[in-house]
Regions:
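Acidic, surface-exposed loops and disordered segments
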Residues: 6-9, 13-228
């Protein structure tokens, strides 16, 4: 269902907010600016949203590999690649994960065909010779710089997570990214002995019955952008 134009929030919200939000997903006046067709734009952006239920159709190893093979091409600072993915498939591993999820996220995490735990590697700079071979010596810039590496790892890991969600959609699946969990508990459970910091958990699969909440408003272009 497409809802066009501005939402009227005069009752629950101050009227000055109305001009700043909309859920217009038709964008007819920008149609000539896109190189992707409408179906592709809907798949990736306009009709895509967080899935909360899934069918029991299995997510294959081939699909998981395909997701990463797209994710890895997204740009990052200095081509660093701090994202690490833990696929939680087995019932035993899923049970261990669920106990670290917030109450509202437990049932859907337990039921999803596949769950990905996304983390960033705090020692990502060790791979400089692989991802920056023409200037591998720059690894030394980050030796002993724990705080700087953590900031860069988190920032670029989150950026890679956005590519990851798009890649999930590209293989015909739906993503349900979540932030309600005990990150330290998940790290102790799955990343002991590794330099990884969990920052997102993503349920993956074919969307099930009543998978979507209604589309919430998005801030308008004129409110978000400035030209200088």
């Amino acid at each position: 269902v497409r809802l066009n134009g501005l939402l009227n929030f005069s009752a629950p919200f101050p009227s000055k907010k109305v001009q700043h939000v909309s859920i217009d997903s038709t964008t007819e006046n920008q149609a000539t600016e896109y190189v992707l067709d409408g179906d592709a734009l809907d798949l990736f952006f306009r009709e895509a949203r967080t899935a909360n239920t899934f069918t029991d159709e299995m997510v294959t190893d081939e699909q998981l590999r395909a997701i990463y093979e797209l994710t890895k091409f997204g740009p990052t600072a200095m081509n660093i690649q701090p994202l690490r993915i833990t696929w939680v498939r087995s019932a035993e591993a899923r049970e261990r994960l669920v106990r670290h999820m917030a109450e509202g996220n437990r049932a859907k995490t337990a039921a999803a065909p596949m769950v990905a735990v996304l983390s960033y590697d705090t020692e990502w700079h060790e791979q400089f010779p692989v991802f920056f071979p023409h200037a591998a010596e720059r690894k030394a810039m980050f030796d002993g710089q724990d705080e700087l590496r953590a900031v860069m790892g988190s920032n670029n890991g989150h950026m890679q997570a956005a590519y990851f969600i798009m890649a999930v959609r590209a293989v015909g699946l739906a993503a349900g990214p979540m932030g309600g969990f005990d990150a330290a508990g998940i790290d102790a459970e799955f990343h002991a002995g590794h330099n990884r910091r969990t920052f997102m958990v993503v349920n993956i699969g074919k969307p099930g019955e009543n998978a979507w909440h209604p589309r919430l408003p998005r801030l308008d272009y004129d409110f978000v952008t400035a030209t200088v």
